[in-house]
C-alpha cells in the first residue's frame, strides 16, 4: 500500500504522453474563429477566390506571428485574406477575395515580399557561415598571416 502511494507520488512529476493527451481532451475547445464580412466589402466578390501557397515561416514574416497585420492589409488593398496552415505546418494556403485585378495585385505584392524575405534569410545564413569560417581561420595557428604595412 505504501509502495503504491510512493509510486503514484513519483509518477505525478512524470506525465506519460497518454496522460497528457487525456488532459488535453478534457480541456474545452477554443471558440471557432468567425469573421464577419467588413461593411466595405461587396458580397459578390466572395465567389471566385484566388488561392496560392507559401512556406509557413514566410507567412510569419509577412503577416506577423499572430497574423496581426492581415486586417491592415485587407483595409489598404480592399481585399479579404485568409491564411490557413496546410501540409502539417510546412505550408500555408493564402486565399484572396476581391476583384480579379485586386487579387492579382495582392498576390504579386505578397510574392514580392516573400522573395525579399527569402533573399534576406539567405544573406543572413551566408553571413553566419562566413563569420564561422573567419573565426575558424583566425584561430588556426598554421594559417599565414598577412603582414600589415
Curated annotation (Swiss-Prot):
InterPro entries: KH_dom_type_1_sf, KHDC1, MOEP19_KH-like. It holds the Pfam family MOEP19. The keyword Chaperone does not apply. GO terms for biological process: actin filament organization; embryonic pattern specification; establishment of spindle localization; establishment or maintenance of apical/basal cell polarity; positive regulation of double-strand break repair; positive regulation of double-strand break repair via homologous recombination; positive regulation of meiotic nuclear division; protein storage. GO terms for molecular function: RNA binding; structural constituent of cytoplasmic lattice. It is found in: Cytoplasm; Nucleus. GO terms for cellular component: cell cortex; cytoplasm; cytoplasmic lattice; nucleus; protein-containing complex; subcortical maternal complex. CDD domains: FILIA_N_like (cd12795). Its main location: cytoplasm. Residues 49-110 form the KH domain. Residues 1-22 are annotated as: Disordered. Keywords: Cytoplasm, Nucleus. Component of the subcortical maternal complex (SCMC), at least composed of NLRP5, KHDC3L, OOEP, and TLE6 isoform 1. Within the complex, interacts with NLRP5, KHDC3L and TLE6 isoform 1. As part of the SCMC interacts with the SCMC-associated protein NLRP4F. The SCMC may facilitate translocation of its components between the nuclear and cytoplasmic compartments. Forms a scaffold complex with KHDC3L/FILIA, and interacts with BLM and TRIM25 at DNA replication forks. Contains an atypical KH domain with amino acid changes at critical sites, suggesting that it may not bind RNA. Component of the subcortical maternal complex (SCMC), a multiprotein complex that plays a key role in early embryonic development. The SCMC complex is a structural constituent of cytoplasmic lattices, which consist in fibrous structures found in the cytoplasm of oocytes and preimplantation embryos. They are required to store maternal proteins critical for embryonic development, such as proteins that control epigenetic reprogramming of the preimplantation embryo, and prevent their degradation or activation. Belongs to the KHDC1 family. PANTHER family: OOCYTE-EXPRESSED PROTEIN HOMOLOG (PTHR19447:SF14), OOCYTE-EXPRESSED PROTEIN HOMOLOG-RELATED (PTHR19447). This is Oocyte-expressed protein homolog. It comes from Homo sapiens.
